[in-house]
Amino acid sequence: MKHQVPGLSDSARDSRPEVPDGVFLVRVDHAQHRWQGQKPFYLLRLSVLEPKPFAGSSIVSRLYCTPKAMWKLGWFLRDFLYDPELLSQDEVDERALRGLIGVVKISHTVVNGISLVNLDGFAPASQWEALAIAILHSAGWQR
């Protein structure tokens, strides 16, 4: 039996626009260590700070920490200026990740019908101005 439910489609849609592929200045809002089968990862929620049209939007993605993917976790931690003392002790403190700021390059893919956000690259927040000038002008965005 089918029923017409007015307004259902509006509530099912995400009210925020999806953050497109690109380069963004972000802050780590949340980080949580999880496991999927034999693959440990950090579930990250990043809040976009720049460019302004996307400020306040969230990016949710996984950063795997398997031996094969350790280089990417290290890249993220170094560029987001994670505590070098904890890093030298092979320690990741989820609370210490919150509030870190850096630049991230993202892309979207669909795997088995599920939309995923890939973290393709990182840079220190200090490089945002230099990166943003070229990106914003080529995309026609205003700061």
Predicted regions and their residues:
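Short beta-rich binding modules
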Residues: 1-143
